[in-house]
From Swiss-Prot:
<comment type="similarity">
    <text>Belongs to the UPF0434 family.</text>
</comment>
<dbReference type="InterPro" id="IPR005651">
    <property type="entry name" value="Trm112-like"/>
</dbReference>
<protein>
    <recommendedName>
        <fullName>UPF0434 protein HCH_02705</fullName>
    </recommendedName>
</protein>
<dbReference type="GO" id="GO:0005829">
    <property type="term" value="C:cytosol"/>
</dbReference>
<dbReference type="Pfam" id="PF03966">
    <property type="entry name" value="Trm112p"/>
</dbReference>
């Protein structure tokens, strides 16, 4: 994930910061407890495509 791109992207729901999860290829918003997938190097910033974080993921 390009650091410049990550710096300008925000959660489409709450406009909060996103963290890059390299292992899962996701952009994570801990505020909303959502993880947005990265497919073929492109972040999919659609709420309906996001998965809900587990309790452990939210706390960790």
């Amino acid at each position: 994930m390009d650091k410049k791109l990550l710096a300008i992207l925000a959660c489409p729901v709450c406009k909060g910061d996103l963290k890059y999860d390299r292992e899962k290829q996701e952009l994570v918003c801990k505020n909303d407890g959502m993880a947005f997938p990265i497919r073929d190097g492109i972040p999919v910033m659609l709420e309906k495509e996001a998965r809900t974080l587990t309790t452990d993921e939210r706390l960790g």
